[in-house]
Amino acid sequence: MKLKTKIHLYTSISLLILLILVHTAVYLIFSSALTSKDAARLADETDNIAEALRAAETEGVALQDMLQAYLPANGMVRVVNGDQKAVMTITKEKAYKDFPLSFHSGETADVRKPDGKLFAEAAVPVIWTDGQVVSLQLVERLENTEESLFLLKIILIAASAAVCIASFFAGSLLARRIINPIRRLMITMKDIQRDKEFKTISLEGQSNDELYQMGLTFNEMAMMLKEHYDKQQQFVQDASHELKTPLTIIESYSSLMKRWGAKKPEVLEESIEAIHSEAVHMKKLTNQLLALAKSHQGLEVDLKTIDLIKAARAVMQTLQSVYQRDILLETDKESLLVKADEERIKQLLTILLDNAIKYSEKPIEMSAGTRNGRPFLSVRDEGIGIPEEHIPHLFERFYRADEARNRKTGGTGLGLSIAKQIADEHGIELSVKSKPGQGTAVTMQFSEQNGGGR
């Protein structure tokens, strides 16, 4: 069963059940009020007849004539003794003589429905002419009440039918209003599956309800998936391009070795050196690709309170011994405490320092401290600098401001992308300031609540 049919069916059935319950309650309450009023009226008339009987005894009026005067237009007056026998019955309709007979020792007023017809019956005890206590009974057919109840029943049925018909069309409109956005969503999803192209659905003219929010969420998800897909495609293309160059070099030098290596030692040595260099470059590239892939897996960051200055000194000493370069650290604090994953922060510092060393022959300067209550660490070199138009793209994968220079330094174009990922994991703001010929400064700015030091 389709969702539209289910909504239509459930709303119609629910409304129908509600109408039946409400209209039944209205009918029963109205019926009870009318019949109670009729029974009370008949009880009053019976009391009046009893008073008239007592007066008739003293005045010598014939009882039958007196009771005939109180006979309802469509009813019966009857006197029943204690032996359940009718002492006197006065009526214009013979059918009333078959009305159920019973003796009532007290006053009663009730409504009966023998043979599906509505009657009101009232009884009051009186003393008859022979001195015995009898039950004076007054019975009346409630035709007006029956007509009123029948009319009410017709009105309620007609009202129920009208409401059900209206609800049928209203339910159809409601179901269509609910289903149409879902149908558009399904069509768009099928189009995406068929065309292999991410699309969004139009939300114009829709109210800000749950269906609108569902469409908005779908559009955001589609755009996010498109962005990730495009990045993945670009990543594969860039990685293929990066691997193609060293593989081409290795293939060329291996062919050269195969042809001339045995005869020319200098060719053999040059080829081995080139192949080794490209193998090292490929290994570095592969390791950075793996590191970047792991960073996107949402691995949990082991946040602990660490001394940023101590971590910087450790990285600085390692790189000084590896590159035999001077790295200076300027700070007015003995320690600078931050909450971070120490190994990831050291990796971030290594990337920044490694980049600075590659593009500058002069000593590298680091500075650490707090600005406006926020811990920071800056890495500055006096190298060739970066043109302003390249700065916004520095953290993109495989981006190079100078392809030839980057190849010469052995860069892969992934280091700063990994650095940005680590910074994002820690809520660190990375900023770059650079001018061609004047050097570059990269600053790590921690959040305000993340720092403390002395």
UniProtKB/Swiss-Prot annotation:
Q: Does the keyword Membrane apply?
A: yes
Q: Which residues form the signal peptide?
A: none
One BP annotation, GO? phosphorelay signal transduction system
Quote the EC number. Answer: 2.7.13.3
Tell me which GO cellular component terms the UniProt record holds: plasma membrane
Q: Which UniProt keywords apply?
A: ATP-binding, Cell membrane, Kinase, Membrane, Nucleotide-binding, Phosphoprotein, Transferase, Transmembrane, Transmembrane helix, Two-component regulatory system
InterPro entries listed in its UniProt record: HAMP_dom, HATPase_C_sf, His_kinase_dom, HisK_dim/P_dom, HisK_dim/P_sf, Sig_transdc_His_kin-like_C, TCS_sensor_his_kinase
Residue ranges that the UniProt entry lists as topological domain Extracellular: 34-153
**What residue ranges are annotated as transmembrane?**
13-33, 154-174
* UniProt membrane topology term: Multi-pass membrane protein
GO molecular function terms noted in the UniProt entry? ATP binding; phosphorelay sensor kinase activity
**SUPFAM superfamilies tied to this protein:** ATPase domain of HSP90 chaperone/DNA topoisomerase II/histidine kinase, Homodimeric domain of signal transducing histidine kinase
Ion transport among the record's keywords?
no
Q: Which residues form the Histidine kinase domain?
A: 238-450
Q: Which reaction does it catalyse?
A: ATP + protein L-histidine = ADP + protein N-phospho-L-histidine
Where it sits in the cell: the answer is: Cell membrane
User: Pfam families under this entry?
Assistant: HAMP (PF00672), HATPase_c (PF02518), HisKA (PF00512)
The entry's function note states: Probable member of the two-component regulatory system YkoH/YkoG. Potentially phosphorylates YkoG.
**Name of the protein:** Sensor histidine kinase YkoH
> Lineage of the source organism?
Bacteria, Bacillati, Bacillota, Bacilli, Bacillales
